[in-house]
Amino acid sequence: MALATNINDLLNKQKIESNRIEFKKGWNPASIYHSICAFANDFDDLGGGYIIVGVNTDDKTGMAIRPVEGVPIEKIDGILQEMVGYNSRITPYYLPRTSIEEVDGRRLIVIWCPAGSYRPYSVPVNVTAKGTKEYYYIRSG
């Protein structure tokens, strides 16, 4: 699926407020799904947000470090398949949009999380384990 904005604008935090962009070095389902849920809840009506997997950040500025690290191409299909299962753990059902983008010769997984229509959303603390308590996540600031 095509992104609603340019990947370089996201990496440079241009045209989109920085609190709507989250960079992740690697695939960590629990952390990523907490963020997906928070963007879907979007109580400030900012338009949701973007999670970009495969990007290191500068600890001082929060900006993307270039060239990006990327996600190994052999892991992308597996991650997308995992997401299909994890998406069903969000209550009520919510489907983020994903796009694979090439930057600096490497691939990134971009997860676009528009504001959901059936807020509030909750997700288990650990989407990879059964029987974990669900929480509502929101973004602030």
Region roles according to the model:
Residues M1-G141:
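Conserved N-terminal catalytic/coupling substructures associated with nucleotide/phosphate chemistry
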